[in-house]
C-alpha cells in the first residue's frame, strides 16, 4: 500500500511538472537586463582561491579546507543521512568506510593523495571523501552553451544544476544538497610557478573538475548523460577491479591541466575510456571551435560542432542526446534555444548569455551557479544563483 502511495505521488508530481514546463509562472519570456547579476535570482559572488600545483598533492587543498571544512562536514553528513534512509541497516556506509580506502592506491596521480589530504585535514573518513567524489559522477544536471558572434568571437556559458532527488526541504521548497553546495562553491586558480595553468569553478572536497578554462586556449564543461550503460556500471566495475576507464571529473581536470590546444583536448575527450556516459562541451578561440561530444563509456557517439557559415552559430546541451526528444518533464533545451534565437547572433555577450541562463526553466531549483567564459579575453566568472518561487524543481 505504501508503495502504491509513493508511485501515485511520483506520477502526480511528473504530471504537474510536465504541465508546468509549458505554462507560466514556471516558464517565462526570455529574461532581459539581468546582468550585471542582481535581484532575487542572484545569491552572490563565488570566492576565488589559489591552488598551488607546486605543492605535494597531499597539501594542495589544506589552506582552502581550513576555511571550508565545517561546511563540507555538513554536506557529507547530509549525504550519509540520505543513504541511511534508503539503506537503514547502515551496511552501505559501513562498506564505504571499510572498503573504499583500500582502493585509493588504484586512483591515478595526483587524485588519491589529494583525497587523502582532504580526509586528514577535515577528519572526514577517507571512504566518505572517495564516495563524495564518486557522487559527482552521477547527479549532474546542467545546461551548457557555446556561441559565436558575427566576428567569430566565442563565448561559453553554463548553469550547474546539481542535487536532484537528494532531499527536498518542504519548509522553503529547495533541494537540501543543492543549498548545501552553495557555501562550498569556489573559483579556483590552479597555478604552477606562480602562473595560471587553468581556472575552474568547483565544490570544496571534489578533486575532479566539471567547469573550467585554459586562458587563450579552450573552455570545457561537462554534463551528465543518461544511459542504460550508465555510471553505476562503471563505478561497480572499478570497485571490482577493472581500472581501464577514467573518472569523468578526473579526465576533465587532466585535460584542463595538461592539454595545450583545442584539437588535442577534443581528441582526448573523444577517445578516452570513461566511467560514466557524459557530454563534453568544448570551446576554443577560433571560428568554428566549439562542439558537444556525446560519450558512451567506451566510445564517442557524436561530435556536434559549430558551423557559422551554415547558420549554426550556437550549440546547446542539457542532459539529452540532441537527436532525441527531451524528457517531457524536463525541457530546458527548447527555452534555451528560443532565447538564443531571440537574442540574435549580433547581440551575443556575457550579458545576453546570462539572460538566457536566467530564464526559467533553464534556471531552476537545482541551479547552484552560472559560469561565463571568454577564452580569447581570458575572462572567467561564476555567480551563485537562486530560483525563488514559483520555480520548477528541475
Swiss-Prot record:
UniProt signal peptide = 1-18
The name this protein carries in UniProt is: Acid ceramidase
Instruction: Give a yes or no for keyword Lipid metabolism in this entry.
Output: yes
Q: Which UniProt keywords apply?
A: Disulfide bond, Glycoprotein, Hydrolase, Lipid metabolism, Lysosome, Secreted, Signal, Sphingolipid metabolism, Zymogen
Q: From what organism does this protein derive?
A: Mus musculus (Mouse)
Family designation:
Belongs to the acid ceramidase family.
Q: Gene for this protein? A: Asah1
Q: The organism's lineage?
A: Eukaryota, Metazoa, Chordata, Craniata, Vertebrata
GO molecular-function annotation terms?
A: fatty acid amide hydrolase activity; N-acylsphingosine amidohydrolase activity
Main location, first listed in the record? other
Q: EC?
A: 3.5.1.23, 3.5.1.-
Q: Name one Pfam family in it.
A: CBAH
Active-site residues, as the UniProt record annotates them: 142 (nucleophile)
Amino acid at each position: 500500500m505504501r508503495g502504491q502511495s509513493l508511485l501515485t505521488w511520483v506520477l502526480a508530481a511528473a504530471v504537474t511538472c510536465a504541465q508546468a514546463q509549458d505554462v507560466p509562472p514556471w516558464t517565462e519570456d526570455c529574461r532581459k537586463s539581468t546582468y550585471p547579476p542582481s535581484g532575487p535570482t542572484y545569491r552572490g559572488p563565488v570566492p576565488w582561491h589559489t591552488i598551488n600545483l607546486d605543492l605535494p598533492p597531499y597539501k594542495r587543498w589544506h589552506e582552502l579546507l581550513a576555511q571550508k571544512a565545517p561546511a563540507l562536514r555538513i554536506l557529507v553528513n547530509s549525504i550519509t543521512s540520505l543513504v541511511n534512509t534508503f539503506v537503514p541497516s547502515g551496511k552501505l556506509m559501513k562498506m564505504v568506510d571499510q572498503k573504499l580506502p583500500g582502493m585509493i592506491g588504484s586512483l591515478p596521480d595526483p587524485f588519491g593523495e589529494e583525497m587523502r589530504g582532504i580526509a586528514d585535514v577535515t577528519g572526514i573518513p577517507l571512504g566518505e571523501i572517495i564516495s563524495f567524489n564518486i557522487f559527482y559522477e552521477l547527479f549532474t544536471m546542467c545546461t551548457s552553451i557555446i556561441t559565436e558572434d558575427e566576428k567569430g568571437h566565442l563565448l561559453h556559458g553554463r548553469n550547474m544544476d546539481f542535487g536532484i532527488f537528494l532531499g527536498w526541504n518542504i519548509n522553503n521548497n529547495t533541494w537540501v544538497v543543492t543549498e548545501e553546495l552553495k557555501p562550498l562553491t569556489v573559483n579556483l586558480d590552479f597555478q604552477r610557478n606562480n602562473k595560471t595553468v587553468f581556472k575552474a569553478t568547483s565544490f570544496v572536497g571534489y578533486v575532479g573538475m566539471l567547469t573550467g578554462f585554459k586562458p587563450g586556449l579552450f573552455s570545457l564543461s561537462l554534463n551528465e548523460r543518461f544511459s542504460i550503460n550508465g555510471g553505476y556500471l562503471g563505478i561497480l566495475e572499478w570497485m571490482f577491479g577493472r581500472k581501464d576507464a577514467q573518472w569523468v571529473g578526473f579526465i576533465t581536470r587532466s585535460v584542463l591541466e595538461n592539454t595545450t590546444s583545442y584539437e588535442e583536448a577534443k581528441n582526448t575527450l573523444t577517445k578516452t575510456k570513461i566511467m560514466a556516459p557524459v557530454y563534453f562541451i568544448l570551446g576554443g578561440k577560433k571560428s568554428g571551435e566549439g562542439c558537444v561530444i556525446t560519450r558512451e563509456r567506451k566510445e564517442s557517439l557524436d561530435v556536434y560542432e559549430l558551423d557559422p557559415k551554415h547558420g549554426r552559430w550556437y550549440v546547446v546541451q542539457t542532459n539529452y542526446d540532441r537527436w532525441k526528444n527531451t524528457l517531457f518533464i524536463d525541457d530546458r533545451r527548447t527555452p534555451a534555444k528560443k532565447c538564443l534565437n531571440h537574442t540574435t547572433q549580433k547581440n551575443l555577450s556575457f550579458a545576453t548569455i546570462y539572460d538566457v541562463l536566467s530564464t526559467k526553466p533553464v534556471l531552476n531549483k537545482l541551479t547552484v551557479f552560472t559560469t561565463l567564459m571568454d577564452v580569447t579575453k581570458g575572462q572567467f566568472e561564476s555567480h551563485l544563483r537562486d530560483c525563488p518561487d514559483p520555480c520548477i524543481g528541475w
